[in-house]
């Protein structure tokens, strides 16, 4: 990090599991890594919408260590090189995550303004967002801790609320940006005067928990409340100062966590023991509700946190009957519904306000007004140790992917795809043998002390306990069918001896 105190450093929080968007979102393939609203994933959209912000530095990403290769690949596909990718061994909410990001950002004497962004939000009006960020940077430079409050358009029970306090004067030197509107609006985030606009900001009076519907209606009707977006802006040192004041135990744990961090390829792996001992808390509870320097900038930019299937339905394009559909879908007498077909035809008749989500291994059917309860299904699946809560049939790996086609107690059939030039780890299994049949491309196979090459329609056998490795030496993807047989077929029956992706040792 350069010693440029004027730089804005985006801190992208990509550690969530997105349980309310099951079955499309899974613990090992969460919603921020999915293309939910267009061809880009939520993470990619979060990063690319920052283009055009002045004094912007390369983003710092915080993610679960299980997602690291998918995060790196998605950033590579949009030609973004992050300043760092910090790997959380466990989730500890936003206050510790941002503390570690701030400590990392200040290495070498820098003290940037942090722009803290969840990786799974939708923002449609980039110009309005950039204008709010510009004003946030100026206020952050004056010592304020900024949160962005979304101007509400309906009573909402799924968000927390922020009560606006006294309006603060614009920071000297604030820019006026050109807009097409000439009307004057006072209640929202922007004052339109002629063809010039200026963001306004308020002291934070207080934060409100997620209300019930009756209270939400009262909050909205008062005109004094905004939705809590979970986006923040402050100088790194100011956040750490306030954290030291209000949650010194969190700051101490985070210092130990970063001190014990190790470099792992292009990632920074945080000290798991130190981080596990850190108290879990949000920025709101740990700092923003206690500091006297909290400022809220109202935001009208087409924001949505995509916190449920009904929220996603709201932002998607709909037909004349109010239906949002994706995939091979046929409807008759269906209205105000969201239907997603991931792997086969889905037909629906006589439905109103429903959600149907079809994937290769699970189907969700729910009333749209019950969308928040999907997380209860995921909790039940986890309690039953069902794999559908964790991953899809198709699982991405740094070398390619595999898809489970069929399985029983003592056998499993997988379709494996290995990218050109990629290879799996040198490994062995203690409880299963494997048959490999190549259906496309060329495979170089290490089997004990033997190295062989096989091509389409050829096969080989890997006995139980045999050291082996699979490589793709060709220029096209390698596809093969793997038939596993044995007493135990779990993915944790892999003992690795050499791995180019840093996954040495037993895979647990």
Question: PLM features: residue spans?
Answer:
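A residue-level structural signature of the nucleotidyltransferase/glycosyltransferase Rossmann-like core
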Residues: 114, 205, 231-232, 304, ...
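Conserved core of the sugar-phosphate nucleotidyltransferase
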Residues: 125-171, 198-265, 269-275, 295
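Short, basic, low-complexity termini and linkers enriched in Ser/Thr/Gly/Pro
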Residues: 1-3, 170-200, 506-508
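Conserved N-terminal catalytic core of the sugar/cofactor nucleotidyltransferase
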Residues: 1-12, 20-30, 35-118, 122-128, ...
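Residue-level signal for inorganic ion chemistry
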Residues: 43, 101, 120, 162, ...
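Left-handed beta-helix
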Residues: 2-7, 237-437, 442-461, 468, ...
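Noncatalytic nucleic-acid binding interfaces
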Residues: 480
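Short coil/turn connectors at secondary-structure junctions
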Residues: 6-8, 56-57, 80-82, 109-112, ...
């Amino acid at each position: 990090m350069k010693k440029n105190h004027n730089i804005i450093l985006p801190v992208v929080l990509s550690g969530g599991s997105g349980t309310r968007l099951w079955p499309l979102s899974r613990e090992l393939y969460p919603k921020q890594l999915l293309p939910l609203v267009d061809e880009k994933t939520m993470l990619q959209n979060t990063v690319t919408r920052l283009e055009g912000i002045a004094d912007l530095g390369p983003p710092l990403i915080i993610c679960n260590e299980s997602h690291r290769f998918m995060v790196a690949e998605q950033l590579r596909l949009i030609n973004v090189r992050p300043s760092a990718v910090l790997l959380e061994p466990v989730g500890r909410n936003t206050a510790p995550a941002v503390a570690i990001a701030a400590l990392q950002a200040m290495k070498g004497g820098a003290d940037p303004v942090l722009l803290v962004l969840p990786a799974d939000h939708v923002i449609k009006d980039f110009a309005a967002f950039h204008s709010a960020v510009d004003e946030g940077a100026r206020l952050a430079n004056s010592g304020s801790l900024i949160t962005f409050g979304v101007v509400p358009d309906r009573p909402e029970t799924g968000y927390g609320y922020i009560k606006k306090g006294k309006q603060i004067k614009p920071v000297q030197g604030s820019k006026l940006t050109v807009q097409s509107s000439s009307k004057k609006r006072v209640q929202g985030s922007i004052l339109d005067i002629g063809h010039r606009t200026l963001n306004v900001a308020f002291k934070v009076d207080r934060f409100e928990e997620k209300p019930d519907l009756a209270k939400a209606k009262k909050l909205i009707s008062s005109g004094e409340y905004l939705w809590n977006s979970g986006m923040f802006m402050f100088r790194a040192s100011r956040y750490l100062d306030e954290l030291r004041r209000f949650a010194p135990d969190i700051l101490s744990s985070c210092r130990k966590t970063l001190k014990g961090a190790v470099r792992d390829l292009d990632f920074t792996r945080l000290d798991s023991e130190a981080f596990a001992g850190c108290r879990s808390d949000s920025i709101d509870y740990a700092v923003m509700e206690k500091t006297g320097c909290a400022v809220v900038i109202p935001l009208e930019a087409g924001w949505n946190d995509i916190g449920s299937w009904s929220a996603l339905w709201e932002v998607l394009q709909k037909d004349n009957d109010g239906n949002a559909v994706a995939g091979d879908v046929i409807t008759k007498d269906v209205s105000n519904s969201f239907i997603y077909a991931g792997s086969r035809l889905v037909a629906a008749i006589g439905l109103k306000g429903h959600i149907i989500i079809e994937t290769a291994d699970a189907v969700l059917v729910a009333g749209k007004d019950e969308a928040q309860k999907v997380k209860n299904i995921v909790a039940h699946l986890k309690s039953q140790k069902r794999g559908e809560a964790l991953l899809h049939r198709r699982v991405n790996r740094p070398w390619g992917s595999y898809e489970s086609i069929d399985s029983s107690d003592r056998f499993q059939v997988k379709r494996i795809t290995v990218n050109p030039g990629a290879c799996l780890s040198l490994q062995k299994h203690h409880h299963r043998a494997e048959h490999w049949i190549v259906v496309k491309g060329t495979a170089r196979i290490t089997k004990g002390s033997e190295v062989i090459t096989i091509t389409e329609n050829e096969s080989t056998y890997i006995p139980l306990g045999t050291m082996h490795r699979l490589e793709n030496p060709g220029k096209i993807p390698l596809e093969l069918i793997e038939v596993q047989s044995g007493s135990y077929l779990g993915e944790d029956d892999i003992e690795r001896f050499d791995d180019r992706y840093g996954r040495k040792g037993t895979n647990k």
